[in-house]
Amino acid sequence: MKKILGFLFVIVILGCGGYFVYVNYIKSKVPKLNLEEEVSNASKYYVYGNHFNIEGNIDIKDKNYDSLCLTLYNGEDKDIEITSDTDGGKINYYISNLINDGLYLDNLDIGTYYLVLKATYSNNEDSEKPIIKYYGIKNDTKYKKTVYYTLSKYNNIITIDSNNEYNTLEFVVKKNNSKNKNYDVTIDPGHGGMDGGGASGNYKETDFTMDISKKVKSNLEKAGITVKLTHDEGDIDKNHVMDEYNKGGRAVIPNEVKSKYTFSIHINKSGSSKVKGIEVYTPSDINYDLAKDIVNNITSNTSLGYSSNRLYKKFDGIYTHNFTESEVKSAIDGYDEKNYKHYNVTTKSNYLYMIRETGGFMTGAYVDSSNPDKVGVNPYYDSNIGNESYLLELGYISNSTDVNTLKEEQDTLAKAISDSIIKEINEKM
């Protein structure tokens, strides 16, 4: 009996080992790809949220192609639509001009893929067999190697590199065998510790932000989504505030834990008790579908309405605030007054640090090591991987109607937010 059990054990081990070898090595081998002499140059590439985007150009002799696209080649072509135009003989192209659109990475099968430019030409001799030409993509950026961690459901690591026989961008997808836990979503309960946030009457912001954040977290986890809170009750001493930067800072945690989305939960305040309603703040140059869904879900299922605020408004309840020219000047003047070294703040920088500093260069992050002792350092400020981040102002603490909603409809409010996030993630899966 022991011999039989031992034999079965060996068979199981060999089977598992064989599958591991197949998945990680044999399956990853890709048939030879023939590339043309001309090479495309990639001037920018990044991953924002869970979408890959690239910008590049190429000068090819024969521009009479019928179609032009990118393709991920692994023995078969996985075509990716692009937008292109010709400028001075060169062809410029990009996947999307929206930072949270592009190639969705998480559902790529395990294996090795080569990203190339693909031109299709008519075949005068055989109309049924068009002529296909492939062009390698030279990585002209400073990001020579990028490592992306997928959603926990897939639990893969994607390494984007250009050190291969084709000298083109290569995507290697493997199982994530790391013991370090990564997260899908980061939720940041606004303020905390001695910083109670906005206050009015008997209430302050932190009377609501932590409870709502934890309820959203619970709802997401029930749906199989892993969630990291930037801080929990008791994490911040009542005589201290949470660091924004450095290791474990609230604007650094999202990239430390490799999350794809960040939601910062706040309650607004106005000098007028008549101002009320929700304001969802976003990055610029995005697809606003998720923001719209959050706003519509909240206004349809709770007593919170759209804010009457018109400043930085993009749509009902949705706002995008990048630094204006005057705000850039004011920031620089402020650095001089405090004797700080200047940061590279521009009109491409989002004004809200939880959106800006979690999004890498795509959202204009700038907190480098210029003032480490006074401000801290965001080690991911210049990263080409960033969280898709939103700041939710869930009504006004200075308005009695909104406060009553925050007290009486908190579960419904949390569900409205979490339902939108679940929908966003599941639709992409």
Region locations from a protein language model:
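Short glycine-rich His-centered loop
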Residues: 182-202
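Basic, ligand-binding patches in group-transfer machinery
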Residues: 18-175
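Cell-wall polysaccharide-cleaving catalytic domain and substrate-binding groove, primarily
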Residues: 195-205, 388, 399-401
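Active-site-proximal helix/loop segments of hydrolytic enzymes
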Residues: 210-429
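N-terminal Sec-pathway targeting helices
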Residues: 1-13
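Short hydrophobic alpha-helical membrane-anchoring segments
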Residues: 15-24, 424, 428
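Boundary/activation segment at the start of structured domains
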Residues: 168-185, 189
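Hydrophobic beta-strand residues in large extracellular and virion-surface proteins
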Residues: 52-58, 68-72, 82, 91-95, ...
